[in-house]
């Protein structure tokens, strides 16, 4: 959780990956709210896969997702694909953060990134203990599991073709191809 992070590490990660002046200029060009307000960034989580920052400008909060400092091959395209999928889920009943803007121009932050609404929460994968009531109440954990299943079921009902998601891969024979990867 944020309050457990080392503040010096947060500052180093933010300084090296989020140029606040360039980000603010880009946000202004995109017409995002808070023009003229100071942009602040706080490291949330990341590592080898992708980095996540909380971005604040005035009363507005977003999450910025970007590749790590050393951008692996293909990662910029992955960011664009993630943005495309989240954007396609707009107005669906699938729980997801609304995306606000994407930047594929490396001169802004050195890699492709996107901004989405900030959602307060926690990751059961990256936390050593879960917040209450999930840490001690098995009924709450059970309810959380059912919410996860419900979200996956909702996602499975999305008409991905009608939402413009063709071209993300080969849907035919997907499961059969996975067996060879095991």
What kind of feature is each model-predicted range?
Residues 2-34:
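Juxta-kinase regulatory segment immediately upstream of eukaryotic protein kinase catalytic domains
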Residues 38-181:
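ATP-binding pocket architecture of kinase catalytic cores
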């Amino acid at each position: 959780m944020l309050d457990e992070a080392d503040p010096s590490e947060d500052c180093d990660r933010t300084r090296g990956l989020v140029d606040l002046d360039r980000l603010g200029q880009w946000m202004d060009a995109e017409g995002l709210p808070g023009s003229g307000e100071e942009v602040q960034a706080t490291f949330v989580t990341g590592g080898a896969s992708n980095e996540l920052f909380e971005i604040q400008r005035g009363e507005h909060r977003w999450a910025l997702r970007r590749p790590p400092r050393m951008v692996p091959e293909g990662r910029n395209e992955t960011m664009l694909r993630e943005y495309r999928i989240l954007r396609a889920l707009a107005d669906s009943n699938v729980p997801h953060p609304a995306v606000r803007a994407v930047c594929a121009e490396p001169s802004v932050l050195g890699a492709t990134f996107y901004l989405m609404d900030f959602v307060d929460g926690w990751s059961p994968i990256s936390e050593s203990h879960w917040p209450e009531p999930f840490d001690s109440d098995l009924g709450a954990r059970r309810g959380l599991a059912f919410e996860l299943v419900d979200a996956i079921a909702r996602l499975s009902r999305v008409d991905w073709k009608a939402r413009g998601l063709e071209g993300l891969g080969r849907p035919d024979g997907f499961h059969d191809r996975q067996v060879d990867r095991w």
